[in-house]
């Protein structure tokens, strides 16, 4: 008789609760693969100049399709993201008010003060002024020639 030591399982025990999720993911990947393969197989393979231009609701495009957006549009997008993230932090703090208590109030107050100081600095630098009425401000330390 030989004595053998029991082998440890390499894989964790099967959890039947994740079986529907696994089947859903497998079916989704299979369906996407079939649809992509069908589109590639059934699609027209001929290239032409008409197929290479962008569709503009039936109007033949003129010039380049790439338009440069003015920088203020990017600034508005960045301001939106910054203040949206700020709102997420403040909302999270408000939801957890019971657990955070007075120290949480001090932290969120410091957070809001830092953001308001940044907003005031941006306003004083002219970052919020754009359009036809925008004027270039000179720093009082700037040397004029």
From Swiss-Prot:
Superkingdom assignment: Bacteria
Q: Which UniProt keywords apply?
A: Cell inner membrane, Cell membrane, Membrane, NAD, Quinone, Translocase, Transmembrane, Transmembrane helix, Transport, Ubiquinone
Annotated EC: 7.1.1.-
Q: Please name the InterPro entries in this protein's record.
A: NAD(P)H_OxRDtase_bac/plastid, NADH_UbQ/plastoQ_OxRdtase_su3, NDAH_ubi_oxred_su3_sf
List the catalysed reactions: a quinone + NADH + 5 H(+)(in) = a quinol + NAD(+) + 4 H(+)(out)
A molecular function annotated in GO for this UniProt entry is: NADH dehydrogenase (ubiquinone) activity
Per the record, membrane topology reads:
Multi-pass membrane protein
**Gene Ontology CC annotation, any one:** plasma membrane
Where are the membrane-spanning stretches?
18-38, 71-91, 104-124
- Give its localization: Cell inner membrane
- HAMAP family cross-referenced by the UniProt entry: NDH1_NuoA
**Which family is annotated?**
Belongs to the complex I subunit 3 family.
Q: Could you tell me what this protein does?
A: NDH-1 shuttles electrons from NADH, via FMN and iron-sulfur (Fe-S) centers, to quinones in the respiratory chain. The immediate electron acceptor for the enzyme in this species is believed to be ubiquinone. Couples the redox reaction to proton translocation (for every two electrons transferred, four hydrogen ions are translocated across the cytoplasmic membrane), and thus conserves the redox energy in a proton gradient.
PANTHER family reported in the protein's UniProt record? NADH-QUINONE OXIDOREDUCTASE SUBUNIT A, NADH-UBIQUINONE OXIDOREDUCTASE CHAIN 3
**Self-association and partners:** NDH-1 is composed of 14 different subunits. Subunits NuoA, H, J, K, L, M, N constitute the membrane sector of the complex.
Mind telling me what this protein is named? NADH-quinone oxidoreductase subunit A 1
Name its species. Geotalea uraniireducens (strain Rf4) (Geobacter uraniireducens)
């Amino acid at each position: 008789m030989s004595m053998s030591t029991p082998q440890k399982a390499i894989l964790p025990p099967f959890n039947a609760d994740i079986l529907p999720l696994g089947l859903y993911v497998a079916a989704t990947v299979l369906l996407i693969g079939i649809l992509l393969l069908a589109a590639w197989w059934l699609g027209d393979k001929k290239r032409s100049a008409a197929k290479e231009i962008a569709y503009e609701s039936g109007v033949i495009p003129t010039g380049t399709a790439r338009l440069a957006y003015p920088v203020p549009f990017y600034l508005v997008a960045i301001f939106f993201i910054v203040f949206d993230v700020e709102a997420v932090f403040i909302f999270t703090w408000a939801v957890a008010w019971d657990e955070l208590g007075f120290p949480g109030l001090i932290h969120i107050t410091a957070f809001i003060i830092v953001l308001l100081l940044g907003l005031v600095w941006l306003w004083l630098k002219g970052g919020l002024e754009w359009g036809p009425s925008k004027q270039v401000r000179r720093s009082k330390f700037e040397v004029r020639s």
